[in-house]
Regions:
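Glycine- and charge-enriched low-complexity intrinsically disordered segments
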Residues: 239-240
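Glycine-centered, phosphate/nucleic-acid-interacting loop/turn motifs that mediate DNA/RNA or nucleotide
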Residues: 17, 202
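Non-heme Fe(II) oxygenase catalytic core, chiefly the N-lobe of the double-stranded beta-helix
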Residues: 5-8, 13-16, 25-194, 207, ...
C-alpha cells in the first residue's frame, strides 16, 4: 500500500463517496485471517446461512480472535489518516457470497446504525429489530460522519459481486434509488484485488450483481464514526480499533 497516496484517497472519497486501495494485506496476513474464518462455529444465532449468502453480524464481537489480524498497520493508518484520530468501530459484518450465488443487491444507501436499545428520540427513526439487535435511522449528520471499510478476501469484479456505485451521490442527502436520473448520474464498478480495500461513505448509492463467473466473494464490512450519540443511546458494537 502506498502511504504517500493516502491524501489522494482521502480527497477521492470526500469528492466521489468511495475509493479503492489495493495491497493493504499481505499474503501471510490473508492466510491468517482465512484460518480463523475456516474454524468458525457457524451455528450461532447472529450467523445467517443460505445457498446464496453467509452473513455474520457483529462480526468483530462474534469472532474476537480476528480483530488483531484485521487491524494491521495499514488499516490503522487508513483510519487515522483518512477518517480521523478519534474514529472507532460502530458496526461489522462478514459477507461470504459463494461461487454459485444468485444474490444481488439493488441500489441503496446504508441508512441505519446499530444501537443498544429502542426508545423514543427526536430525529431517530424508523426502527428495526433483527435477532435482538436494534437498528435505527439517525439524523443525517450522523450518517454523513460514518466511513466504511470493505476488506476484500478475494479478487472482486463485476462478475462476482463488486460494488457498483453512483459517484457523488453521498452529497445529496437521503437519495431514493427509484428517483435516480440515469441521464445525469453514472455508474462505476469498484473492482478490488484480494487483500485490497474499498472505502465508502454510507450515503453513496451502491449495489451489486449476481455472480456469473463461478468465483466466491468474501468481504469484511466495518463502519467507523467519531460521533457520540445522545447519552441515553449507545453504539451497540462500539469498539476502539
Amino acid at each position: 500500500m502506498s502511504l504517500n497516496n493516502l491524501e489522494n484517497h482521502k480527497s477521492h472519497i470526500e469528492k466521489y463517496g468511495f475509493a479503492v486501495i489495493n495491497d493493504v494485506f499481505s499474503q501471510k496476513e490473508l492466510e491468517d485471517i482465512n484460518l480463523v474464518l475456516q474454524n468458525i462455529d457457524t451455528s450461532k444465532e447472529n450467523f445467517r446461512k443460505s445457498e446464496d449468502l453467509f452473513v455474520i453480524r457483529q462480526f468483530l464481537k462474534e469472532v474476537p480472535e480476528i480483530k488483531d489480524l484485521v487491524f494491521n498497520e495499514n488499516i490503522r493508518k487508513v483510519v487515522k489518516e483518512i477518517f480521523g484520530e478519534k474514529y472507532f468501530v460502530v458496526k461489522s459484518i462478514y459477507f461470504d457470497k459463494p461461487e454459485t450465488s444468485n444474490w444481488y443487491v439493488a441500489y441503496h444507501q446504508d441508512l441505519t446504525i446499530s444501537v443498544d436499545k429502542k426508545l423514543e428520540l427526536a430525529n431517530f427513526g424508523p426502527w428495526t429489530t433483527k435477532q435482538n439487535q436494534f437498528a435505527v435511522q439517525p439524523p443525517l449528520n450522523v450518517l454523513e460522519n460514518i466511513y466504511t471499510i470493505r476488506i476484500h478476501l478475494d479478487d472482486t469484479d463485476e462478475n462476482n459481486g463488486a460494488l457498483k456505485v453512483v459517484p457523488k451521490s453521498h452529497t445529496k442527502g437521503i437519495y431514493r434509488p427509484e428517483t435516480i436520473d440515469w441521464t445525469v448520474e453514472k455508474e462505476e464498478i469498484c473492482n478490488v484485488e484480494k487483500g485490497g480495500i474499498m472505502l465508502m461513505k454510507p450515503l453513496t448509492l451502491h449495489g451489486s450483481n449476481r455472480t456469473t463467473n463461478g468465483k466466491k466473494r468474501r468481504v469484511l464490512h466495518i463502519e467507523f464514526s467519531d460521533i457520540e450519540l445522545p447519552e441515553v443511546l449507545q453504539w451497540s458494537e462500539r469498539m476502539n480499533g
